[in-house]
């Protein structure tokens, strides 16, 4: 029987160029909820999470992408891989489990327009 609950790490990405991100751990996540439901949950959580700097709380995140899955190979990119978007970006309306999310998956949460801009010219400013 598959585990219905999982521990997920969500990396809040404010800037790809400056490698400005903050990882957060979410426990007891229902993998049968939709991507939209999880995005709403994360946005609500970060808006009130103690210890999270205001710039991270107020940023307009809109997209989730799988960075790493348990027991899988990690990317050499410091923020996240720029490859396999079709496979790794979570689709609206899809259930987390159906999108490939499992226990101990690490996800990036970012603004898609920033990602597209960075992907077209991937340089770092630090």
From Swiss-Prot:
InterPro entries: UPF0538 (IPR018794). Coiled coil: none annotated. It comes from the Eukaryota. Belongs to the UPF0538 family. This is UPF0538 protein C2orf76 homolog.
């Amino acid at each position: 029987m598959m585990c219905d609950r999982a521990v997920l790490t969500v990396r809040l990405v404010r800037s790809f160029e400056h490698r400005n991100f903050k990882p957060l751990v979410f426990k007891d996540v229902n993998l049968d909820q939709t991507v939209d439901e999880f995005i709403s949950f994360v946005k609500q959580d970060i808006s009130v999470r103690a210890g999270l700097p205001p710039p991270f709380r107020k940023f307009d995140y809109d997209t989730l992408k799988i960075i790493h899955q348990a027991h899988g190979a990690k990317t050499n990119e410091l923020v996240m891989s720029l490859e396999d978007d079709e496979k790794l970006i979570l689709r609206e309306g899809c259930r987390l489990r159906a999108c490939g999310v499992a226990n101990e998956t690490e996800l990036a949460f970012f603004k898609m327009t920033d990602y597209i801009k960075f992907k077209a010219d991937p340089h770092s400013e630090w």
